Design a protein with these regions (language model features):
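Membrane-interface junctions at the ends of membrane-embedded or membrane-associated helices
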Residues: 1, 150-159, 202-208
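Solvent-exposed, well-ordered loop and adjacent helix/strand elements within mature globular domains
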Residues: 13-53
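Extracytosolic and intramembrane catalytic regions of membrane-associated proteins
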Residues: 238-445
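N-terminal signal-anchor transmembrane alpha helix
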Residues: 1-18
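Hydrophobic alpha-helical segments
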Residues: 54-182
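Internal/C-terminal transmembrane anchor helices
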Residues: 165-186, 191-240
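Alpha-helical transmembrane segments and their helix-start/interface "positive-inside/aromatic belt" motifs
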Residues: 1-6, 72-77, 212-218
């Protein structure tokens, strides 16, 4: 039962991350920041690590259920769970007000503020978990891994016989289907798992050498690799972000007040120095307003800073989209004008104008020319300033104007760099990678 549950969850978890390996890469980059784990040397390998973890997690899940390479599978699962449990514990206990010492590029010691990762990315954007929730989840999985280790090293686990395999694989598919349909609103995981199991079982029947289990593993890796290749070169199969097809950007930008909902409550962290001990003390603005006129406070503390971090006191509705801007050359945000345009809008999105320079531009120009002649609005939206946008537009003969937006938000809008977004009345109609830019005729058919 432990093999079935842990293996099935590994398959689902790995597939969700593999579906959006770029998003998982961004999460790894957060962990590598100096204020977090301080591993800047790994940033250039973030995508490779993302793919390795995604495929490795699926492979371990399949191997657990079918009983392949039990000692190796159990050991790697134990190591992985120990690491993930430590990481989520570290994340859950991160103090945003604390500082840490790091050694910078010059070799000097520098004190910087902690950078706390707010979500672990275990299930991508599909199931956002707080660090504490992620830690509890990993703790439970770690406990379930213990019987798997015991069974593997006592010789109780082996490659499934036909009857046992049928029971375990069927049970796993039921668990994956229930998880996918109930929590992910996505039935693809059960299809993917069925294909992976079919490949593994087919190779088990086809080969009888001592390397059979390694050949089965290779087959599953090929299945994972093909899926990963598709999502990296096109777009995620399932999009859980607020810019997904069918989502209204207008509605997702509305505040709690606009929707008649209760918003979260925040306070600002103020810093004061105790005159007697000379130690700094953090006092929240909501508490400060109650004591700032008290004689003991006036006499015992002096102000250091009112510019502290914001602290959430209570949860509430927060806009799904908060930082989407369309800034023109004069520094004006024209986002409302674009979103309220009555008709169709095509947005050429580039999170990194230099890295995506010219990719798909010929197809984009042809599409834009036809679309604009039919009254569509077409714009470019990049991370670059106005002058760089204008240079790009001139160099590649783009017939549409370019605007600027925050790079982090552009990464959320579309994973491909560049990518294309089609909106109508503020609602996302479709998105494409630069490799898949359509012709205008296909849009109006």
């Amino acid at each position: 039962m432990c093999r079935l549950l842990v293996g099935s969850l590994f398959i689902v978890s790995g597939l969700i991350k593999s579906n959006d390996a770029m998003g998982f890469m961004y999460k790894l980059e957060e962990y590598f920041e100096p204020g977090a784990l301080n591993l800047p040397g790994l940033e250039e390998y973030a995508l490779s690590l993302s793919v390795l973890i995604c495929i490795g997690e699926i492979l371990l899940g399949v191997a657990m259920v079918i009983g392949a390479l039990p000692k190796l599978t159990a050991t790697l699962t134990g190591v992985l769970m120990a690491f993930f449990t430590w990481l989520t514990w570290y994340t859950a206990n991160c103090d945003p007000f604390a500082t840490k010492m790091i050694v910078d590029a010059t070799g000097a010691s520098v004190e910087i503020a902690n950078q706390c990762v707010l979500a672990c990315g275990c299930f991508g954007n599909a199931i956002p978990l707080t660090p504490y929730e992620s830690f509890i989840k990993d703790l439970v999985l770690s406990v379930l891994t213990v019987p798997i280790l015991i069974g593997a090293f006592n010789g109780w686990t082996r490659l499934n016989e036909k009857r046992e395999g049928l029971v375990l694989i069927t049970g796993s598919l039921v668990v994956i289907y229930a998880f996918g349909a109930g929590m992910l609103h996505w039935n693809f995981p059960v299809l993917f798992a069925a294909i992976a199991y079919a490949v593994a079982e087919g190779l088990k029947v086809r080969f009888s050498s001592k390397y059979r289990e390694w050949i089965m593993a290779a087959g599953v890796i090929v299945v994972c690799g093909l899926f990963q290749y598709y999502t990296l070169n096109h777009l995620p199969v399932k999009d859980y972000r607020p810019y997904a097809v069918g989502e209204s950007v207008i509605e997702n930008r509305k505040s709690a007040d606009e929707l008649g909902l209760e918003g979260p409550q925040y306070a600002t962290a103020y810093t004061f120095k105790n005159k007697e001990t000379l130690e700094d003390t953090i006092i929240l603005s909501t508490d400060w307003i109650k004591i700032y006129n008290e004689p003991w406070f006036k006499e015992g503390f002096e102000t250091v800073s009112f510019d502290g971090d914001e602290v959430k006191l209570s949860d509430g509705y927060e806009p799904l989209i908060m930082d989407f801007q369309i800034v023109d050359g004069d520094g004006e945000d024209v986002v409302d004008e674009i979103l309220q345009f009555e008709g169709d809008v095509l947005i050429h999105v580039s999170k990194d104008l230099d890295a995506g320079a010219g990719l798909g531009q010929e197809a984009l120009n042809a599409l834009a020319t036809q679309a604009m002649s039919k009254g569509w609005k077409v714009i470019g939206l990049t991370n670059a300033p106005f002058d760089q946008n204008e240079s790009y537009r001139t160099k590649f003969n783009a017939p549409y104007p370019f605007y600027t937006c925050d790079q982090t938000e552009l990464k959320i809008v579309v994973r491909s760099n560049p990518g294309l977004v089609w909106m109508r009345d503020g609602i996302i109609q479709e998105k494409w990678s630069w490799r898949d830019v359509p012709t205008f005729d296909t849009l109006v058919d």
